[in-house]
Amino acid sequence: SSNIATLFYAYLAYKTYFRNAIIQLNERVGFANFASYEERKTDYILEDYYHLLYKAAIEGFLEKGTDRYIEARVVPKDTEEGIVRSLFDYCKEIDEKYKKKYSFIFHFIKQRDEPKGEGFYRHYDLRHAIKKQAYAIYQFRSNRKNWEGDNNLVGKVVGLDAANSEVFCRPEVYAQAFRFLRGHEITIDEE
């Protein structure tokens, strides 16, 4: 019957629209596009399913062509264990055929400064959070287990950046973390 066909078509159209909105699949580019979705999507998705967003975004992009490569941005956790767990969860969901076609960039999120009062410098809380994240990245990169075999998680991380406009947060807030991590040479002892 035509009513069922019409309803099914409406369902498919809405489902496609919703999926594209969730994974930011549209014609707009830049941070404004990213920021407009990032805050909202976590409100509707349970934390247990959040890693599936990366599967949908990465595979959705890669399946549209054979010569594609994507660098997905992820916010680093503040412990080595948190970083390993999140990257492992993202990687295990993505189809094996795309294994060499994606990587990750650790993405520090800028925030508006909340003044703490006299005696505290600008972005006091954010600088401490970034310090914890930078140290966790250092530990993650230094741990031999994260380099080994098919679970070479460190090799999947190819960069580091800070997101958002400089209106709310100036570059020097991240300078120490970037200098610390840039100078981090990895040497893995052979046993």
Predicted regions span which residues?
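Metal-cofactor-binding active-site regions of metalloenzymes
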Residues: 1-191
